């Protein structure tokens, strides 16, 4: 111990411990995480050297908060890249001090605990040298050392400009460096725009993104022979999990997590270049079923906006098929209230909409969101059996939930795979295989058009555009006439048009997109917004990727999804604003403003309560999620909750969250509702800054059940007439 104490009191011990913490440990961790690139190491050294020269002779109590925050950023980087494949942004930073958000995001644990332990150990070692060496003088660093950060940052900047690299940001940058570079670029763009002056931006041509295109050559000689339609949406599955897709684009990703689905793909038509336009289940379902882009900016989901409209919803696929004689059905493994699917699905044309409450079979494993995938598909098989008994043709849309965080799988799967996420995917693959094999034995595949796809992509670390890479596997009775690989760029906006075109039914002009059952001899425009990046392909070989709103890189790329693309340069100014203008125009396809629309999330449904609240998301009693509130607006909320059982009280909590972080609105922590004295509230709050992804979580517990007869939300500008009082109930955003 005395030898260690003497070493810790050496004059250079504090400097060496700081170098270990901010230079050696980050470089080693980058290598261990598999993020090894010359630019990444250069960025680590630049940030580390800056910390060394800045903190070496500072008092320990000044340096410690800086180093703790730096270490927290490093941990957050690894965790967020592991979870969703992107670096944290400035809007994420304040979430790091929210314990509930951290717990919900990590499932109570870290994806990379060794990284956190290494940083903590190095930080404790540095602090020990500071405390033991108190009173000892610190030698000044040579003047040449002060130039090291400048030289390293300049070298990184020069390398990026002389030999541009389009790799993932976390492979090229240390997070503080990336945030600094982004801020500098923003200031540069603002200066350029200030020098240009106020220039009115012309409206870009939108026909290529919004019009129906049926000009391709039909793949089928006659209208499709299928009697029924089955759409299976798999939660979060990227296109790279299908072997045929990987081979078609030459992907380096070779993990075969879904071998069964890949074997089914050998029997069907695959579309390798298939674009998912946004994150979130409700947005993916809207694009699929209503032939339109959902918001490309985290605004109010268009499915919620659709509740205010009584004409556009009739153009959605379920309504169109119902009009042509189909019975239309929606079944998912989770509860329906979250994201208001209990209201949206009937409104767009489903005759029957069912969630967790429909299932009578037991789960095979505990899962907070609802049915595990094996139990779900067993229930879905019974549902199809009921549909087969009717004479009417049917359309059934299925949505799984088992591959949603937190990933759950049986113990034997967890032993077989490296991560719970992979185990959950493998469990889904086996369950889906058994379901499809059962349909084949029952003869369902002989007269049913089956489309297997995903609602969104949970991404894959190190796979280019994985967050936007979807898949579309089509199994049709006339499969021999269809190609195994469908060449061309398609996306979720094409699905409704495609199915109507398959049956040779008229396609409403309100829909967008191309038909998967036609061969086109020209490119097409298409967009996506995932992982904070707006992406646009102009249909003429140029793919652009923009950090919102005014800074873009562009590449030469024949299609949208590709293993690699030829980097051509960067641009800002008018071309970048035109891409943003296209996204803005798509966002306004339903409503021109988020103001003055009353959303009614209440209903006369009886909702059983649990003995305790387990999860703010899965236990939500209403679907008021991911709303948008403009800057300077005023939001008013009115609610009525009644306990159904006269002998039982219901204990109610109301929380507000923005981007999943709690927002304090001054509401009571807990309230009571009884049959004789319902809980009635009417409150409002200001929006001094824009709010997006704003959600209400109405939670309850007790031994009885409740009725949420009213949960009205309206956002308006101060001084406007209060629509919440004046609009009749039958003109509000609610479905029948």
Regions found by a protein language model. Give the residues of each.
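Transmembrane and membrane-interface helices of multi-pass
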Residues: 2-185
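Generic alpha-helical structural element
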Residues: 17, 61, 88, 108, ...
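Short alpha-helical hairpin
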Residues: 21-29, 202-205, 400-403
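Juxtamembrane/interfacial segments around transmembrane helices
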Residues: 66-71, 91-95, 114-127, 191-205, ...
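Membrane-interface segments at or immediately adjacent to transmembrane helices
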Residues: 101, 153-233
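Solvent-exposed soluble domains appended to multi-pass membrane proteins
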Residues: 210-608, 689-693, 710, 714, ...
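Extracellular and organelle-lumenal recognition/adhesion modules and their flexible linkers in secreted
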Residues: 602-734
């Amino acid at each position: 111990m005395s030898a260690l104490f003497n070493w810790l009191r050496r004059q250079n011990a504090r400097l060496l411990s700081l170098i270990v913490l901010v230079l050696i440990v980050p470089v080693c961790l980058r290598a261990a995480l598999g993020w090894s690139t010359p630019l990444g190491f250069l960025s680590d050294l630049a940030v580390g050297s800056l910390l060394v020269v800045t903190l070496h002779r500072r008092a320990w109590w000044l340096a410690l908060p800086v180093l703790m925050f730096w270490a927290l950023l490093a941990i957050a980087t690894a965790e967020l890249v592991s979870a969703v494949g992107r670096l944290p942004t400035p809007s994420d930073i304040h979430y790091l001090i929210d314990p509930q958000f951290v717990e919900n995001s990590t499932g109570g644990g870290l994806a990379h605990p060794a990284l956190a332990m290494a940083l903590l150990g190095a930080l404790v070692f540095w602090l020990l040298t500071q405390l033991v060496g108190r009173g000892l003088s610190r030698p000044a660093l040579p003047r040449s050392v002060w130039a090291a950060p400048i030289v390293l940052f300049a070298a990184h900047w020069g390398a990026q400009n002389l030999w541009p690299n389009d790799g993932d940001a976390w492979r090229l940058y240390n997070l503080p460096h990336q945030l600094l570079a982004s801020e500098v670029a923003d200031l540069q763009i603002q200066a350029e725009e200030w020098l240009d002056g106020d220039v009115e931006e012309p409206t870009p041509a939108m026909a290529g993104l919004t019009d129906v295109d049926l000009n391709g050559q039909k793949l089928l000689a006659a209208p499709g022979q299928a009697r029924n339609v089955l759409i299976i949406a798999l939660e979060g599955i990227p296109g790279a999990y299908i072997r045929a897709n990987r081979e078609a684009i030459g992907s380096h990703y070779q993990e075969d997590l879904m071998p069964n689905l890949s074997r089914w793909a050998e029997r069907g038509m695959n579309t390798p270049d298939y674009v998912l336009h946004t994150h979130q289940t409700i947005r993916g379902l809207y694009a699929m079923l209503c032939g339109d882009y959902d918001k490309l900016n985290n605004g109010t989901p268009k499915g919620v906006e659709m509740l205010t409209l009584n004409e556009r919803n009739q153009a959605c696929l379920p309504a169109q098929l119902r009009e042509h004689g189909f019975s239309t059905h929606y079944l998912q493994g989770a509860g329906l209230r979250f994201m208001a699917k209990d209201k949206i699905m009937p409104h767009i044309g489903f005759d029957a909409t069912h969630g967790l409450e429909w299932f009578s079979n037991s789960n095979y494993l505990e899962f907070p969101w609802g049915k595990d995938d094996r139990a779900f598909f067993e229930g879905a098989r019974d549902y199809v059996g009921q549909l087969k008994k009717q004479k009417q043709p049917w359309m059934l849309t299925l949505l799984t939930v088992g591959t949603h965080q937190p990933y759950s799988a049986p113990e034997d799967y967890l032993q077989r795979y490296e991560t719970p996420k992979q185990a959950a995917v493998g469990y889904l693959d086996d369950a889906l295989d058994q379901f499809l094999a059962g349909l084949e034995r029952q003869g369902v595949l002989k007269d049913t058009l089956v489309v297997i796809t995903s609602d969104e992509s949970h991404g894959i670390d190190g796979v280019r555009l994985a967050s936007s890479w979807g898949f579309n596997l089509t199994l049709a009775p006339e499969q021999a006439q269809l190609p195994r690989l469908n060449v061309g760029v398609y996306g979720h906006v094409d699905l409704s048009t495609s199915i109507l075109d398959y049956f040779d039914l008229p396609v409403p002009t309100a829909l967008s997109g191309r038909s998967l059952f036609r061969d086109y001899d020209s490119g097409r425009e298409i967009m996506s917004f995932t992982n904070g990046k707006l992406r646009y392909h102009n249909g003429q070989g140029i793919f652009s990727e923009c950090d919102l709103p005014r800074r873009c890189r562009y590449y030469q790329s024949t299609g949208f999804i590709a293993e690699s693309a030829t980097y051509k340069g960067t641009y800002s100014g008018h071309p970048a604003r035109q891409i943003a203008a296209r996204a803005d125009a798509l966002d306004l396809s339903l409503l021109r403003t988020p103001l003055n629309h009353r959303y009614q999330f209440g209903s006369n449904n009886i909702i059983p309560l649990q003995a305790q609240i387990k999860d703010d998301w899965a236990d939500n009693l209403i679907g008021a999620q991911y709303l948008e509130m403009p800057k300077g607006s005023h939001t008013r909320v009115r609610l009525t909750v009644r306990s159904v059982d006269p002998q039982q009280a219901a204990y109610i909590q109301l929380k507000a969250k923005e981007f999943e972080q709690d927002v304090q609105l001054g509401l009571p922590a807990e309230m009571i509702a009884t049959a004789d004295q319902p809980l009635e509230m009417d409150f409002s709050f200001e929006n001094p800054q824009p709010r997006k992804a704003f959600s209400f979580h109405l939670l309850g517990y007790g031994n009885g059940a409740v009725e949420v007869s009213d949960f009205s939300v309206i956002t308006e500008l101060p001084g406007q007439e209060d629509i919440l009082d004046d609009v009749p109930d039958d003109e509000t955003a609610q479905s029948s």
